[in-house]
């Protein structure tokens, strides 16, 4: 699976892993269902068949305020990061990330039928912070909303 590329999650993922803390799969705009959110994927450190997906939100200002409040309270915020996607400011919601395997993914393709890719510096920042947040979560802190370790175990068992 290529690095720095964006993906959508399949409907089947939400059927197989019912967790109300997962970001919902489709938004309806003007009566039309759209695949949302899109995700940045990076491989798991232990199992290369499993990827971690970080949802991307266009609600930049909303998440800037939330991140700023966390910085004021804790001195830093690595559960929400910021970058650009297709020339627009975006929030990367590490706090909402989830594990997945390739069959549940669909590449985000642009109008030229090319995969949408991100700047390597943005990807490096998101991946570094996501791995730190995973390490914190493994020590028992509730810093990720979905039950990612339950989903991870189910994915491992299915491989």
Model segments located where?
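A broad, low-specificity signal marking well-ordered, structured residues that form hydrophobic/aromatic
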Residues: 5-7, 51, 92-98
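Compact nucleic-acid interaction/catalytic patches
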Residues: 29-35, 46-86
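Short beta-strand-centered aromatic/proline hotspots
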Residues: 38-42
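C-terminal terminal-subdomain/extension
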Residues: 67-159
